[in-house]
C-alpha cells in the first residue's frame, strides 16, 4: 500500500511550471508502473508531460474519467517546512494533494477490473496554458475519451471532511487582459509636445469599472480587475507607453463575452480620444466557467450526503478559474471542492493543507468511483 503522506511531501518538493513538469511526470510514472504492473486490463499513455491511465472494463458500457492537475506556481514558499517546495516554485494551489489523491484512487481502483472503463488523467498546465484544452484539441484521449468526467479542487477555508459543490456553476470563466497605450514621450515641462500614455491608461482604469456597474445585469456576476500597471522611467519624463495587465471573471460565458466586447470598445474609444495606438490581447482559451452537469451533480451530492465520513455542502459559485471548465464544456461531469483546513489561502506562500485529507479523500471518493464504474445500487459498498 502506498504511503500517501510520503508521496505528497515528495511531490510538494518538486513543483514545476506548466508543460515543464518533467520531474513530476517521471515521479508519477514510477508509482503508476508499480501500481499497474501485471494487470493486463490497464494501459498507460503520455502526452507531453501529461499521463493517461486507462482501466478497461470487463463489461464496459461507458468510460468514467477522473482528472487531476500536476503543475505548480512561480511562488517562493515561506512555510519553513522541512519538505517545502524549492527553486522559486511552490505547490501553492494544492496540486500535490490532487495528484496524491489520484494515485491513491488508482491504487484502490486497480485492485480488480471494473465493469465500466475508468480513465485517470494527470493533466499538465492548468495554471498557465489550459492544458485540458490543449490535450482535448490534440486528440490526446483518442478512444479513451470519457463519457463522464469528475475532478476536485482543494479549498483551505473548508474543514477536512467537507465536500462542497452544486448542480450548476461552480467556478467562473476567466479571461486574461494585456493592454498597452502607445503615445509620445517627452519632457515633463513640455506636455503639449508629447502624448502621455500614462494619463490615457489611468483614464481607462477608471472607465473600465463602468462595465460591471452599467453594462452587466445586476443579477449576474462579473469582475474586472487590473492588478499590474507599468509606465514611464523617471519623474520628469512623460511616458511613451503604459502597460496594463488584468483579468475578467464571470459566471457565464455570455457575460464574459459581453465584458470582453465592452472592454475592447472602451480601450479603442479612449485611444481614439487621446490620439493614441493600442495593443490589446484578450486570452480566455480553455478557462471557461465550470458548469456542473445537473443530473450527475445531483447523483454525486446524494451519494456523499449518505457517506458518514463526509460533510456535503451545497455551495455558491466562486470567482476562481479552472481549465476543467473547458473539458466540462465538451463532456458532462462534476467538479467539487475538498476541504483542507489551511489558515493561508490558495496561491499563498504559506498555504499548508491538513494531510489528514489524503486518507479521507481516497477512502471516500474511491467508494463513489466504485459506485460509478461497477454500476452499484445506491448505498452498496465494495469490499477492498
Curated annotation (Swiss-Prot):
Query: Which pathway does the UniProt entry assign to this protein?
Result: Amino-acid biosynthesis; L-lysine biosynthesis via DAP pathway; LL-2,6-diaminopimelate from (S)-tetrahydrodipicolinate (acetylase route): step 3/3
Q: Which molecular function term from Gene Ontology is one that the record holds? A: N-acetyldiaminopimelate deacetylase activity
* Alphabetical list of CDD domains matching this protein: M20_Acy1_YkuR-like (cd05670)
Q: Which residues of this protein are catalytic?
A: 69, 127 (proton acceptor)
On the tree of life, the source organism's domain of life is Bacteria
Extract one GO BP annotation from the record. Answer: lysine biosynthetic process via diaminopimelate
The EC class name is hydrolase
Q: Which reaction does it catalyse?
A: N-acetyl-(2S,6S)-2,6-diaminopimelate + H2O = (2S,6S)-2,6-diaminopimelate + acetate
This protein's record includes keyword Acyltransferase: no
SUPFAM superfamilies per UniProt:
Bacterial exopeptidase dimerisation domain, Zn-dependent exopeptidases
Per UniProt, the keywords (alphabetical) are: Amino-acid biosynthesis, Diaminopimelate biosynthesis, Hydrolase, Lysine biosynthesis
Which pairs are disulfide-linked?
A: none
Name the EC number(s). 3.5.1.47
Q: Which InterPro entries match?
A: AcetylDAP_deacetylase, Amidohydrolase, Bact_exopeptidase_dim_dom, Peptidase_M20, Peptidase_M20_dimer
Family per similarity comment: Belongs to the peptidase M20A family. N-acetyldiaminopimelate deacetylase subfamily.
Which HAMAP family does the annotation name? DapEL (MF_01692)
Its function, per the record, reads: Catalyzes the conversion of N-acetyl-diaminopimelate to diaminopimelate and acetate.
- Annotated protein name in UniProt: N-acetyldiaminopimelate deacetylase
Report the source organism: Lactococcus lactis subsp. lactis (strain IL1403)
- Name the gene for this chain: yciA
Amino acid at each position: 500500500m502506498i504511503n500517501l503522506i510520503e508521496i505528497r511531501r515528495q511531490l510538494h518538493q518538486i513543483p514545476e511550471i506548466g508543460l515543464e513538469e518533467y520531474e513530476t511526470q517521471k515521479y508519477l510514472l514510477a508509482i503508476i508502473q508499480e501500481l499497474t504492473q501485471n494487470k493486463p486490463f490497464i494501459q498507460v499513455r503520455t502526452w507531453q508531460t501529461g499521463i493517461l491511465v486507462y482501466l478497461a472494463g470487463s463489461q464496459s458500457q461507458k468510460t468514467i474519467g477522473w482528472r487531476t492537475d500536476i503543475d505548480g506556481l512561480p511562488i517562493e514558499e515561506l512555510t519553513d517546512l522541512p519538505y517545502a517546495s524549492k527553486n522559486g516554485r511552490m505547490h501553492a494551489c494544492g496540486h500535490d494533494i490532487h495528484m496524491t489523491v489520484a494515485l491513491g484512487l488508482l491504487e484502490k481502483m486497480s485492485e480488480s477490473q471494473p465493469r465500466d472503463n475508468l480513465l485517470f488523467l494527470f493533466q499538465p498546465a492548468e495554471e498557465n496554458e489550459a492544458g485540458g484544452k490543449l490535450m482535448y484539441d490534440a486528440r490526446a484521449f483518442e478512444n479513451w475519451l470519457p463519457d463522464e468526467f469528475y475532478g476536485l479542487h482543494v479549498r483551505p477555508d473548508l474543514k477536512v471532511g467537507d465536500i462542497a459543490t452544486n448542480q450548476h456553476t461552480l467556478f467562473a470563466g476567466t479571461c486574461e487582459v494585456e493592454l498597452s497605450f502607445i503615445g509620445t514621450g517627452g519632457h515633463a515641462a513640455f506636455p503639449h509636445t508629447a502624448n502621455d500614455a500614462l494619463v490615457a491608461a489611468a483614464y481607462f482604469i477608471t472607465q473600465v469599472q463602468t462595465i460591471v456597474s452599467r453594462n452587466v445585469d445586476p443579477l449576474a456576476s462579473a469582475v474586472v480587475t487590473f492588478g499590474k500597471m507599468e509606465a514611464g522611467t523617471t519623474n520628469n519624463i512623460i511616458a511613451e507607453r503604459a502597460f496594463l495587465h488584468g483579468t475578467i471573471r464571470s459566471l457565464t460565458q455570455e457575460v464574459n463575452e459581453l465584458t470582453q466586447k465592452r472592454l475592447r470598445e472602451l480601450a479603442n474609444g479612449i485611444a481614439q480620444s487621446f490620439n493614441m495606438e493600442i495593443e490589446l490581447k484578450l486570452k480566455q482559451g480553455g478557462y471557461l466557467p465550470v458548469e456542473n452537469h445537473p443530473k450527475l451533480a445531483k447523483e454525486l451530492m446524494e451519494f456523499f450526503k449518505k457517506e458518514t465520513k463526509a460533510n456535503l455542502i451545497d455551495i455558491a459559485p466562486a470567482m476562481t478559474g479552472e481549465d476543467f471548465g473547458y473539458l466540462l464544456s465538451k463532456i458532462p461531469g462534476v467538479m467539487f471542492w475538498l476541504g483542507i483546513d489551511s489558515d493561508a489561502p490558495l496561491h499563498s506562500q504559506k498555504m499548508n493543507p491538513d494531510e489528514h485529507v489524503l486518507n479521507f479523500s481516497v477512502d471516500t471518493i474511491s467508494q463513489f468511483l466504485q459506485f460509478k464504474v461497477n454500476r452499484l445500487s445506491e448505498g452498496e459498498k465494495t469490499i477492498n
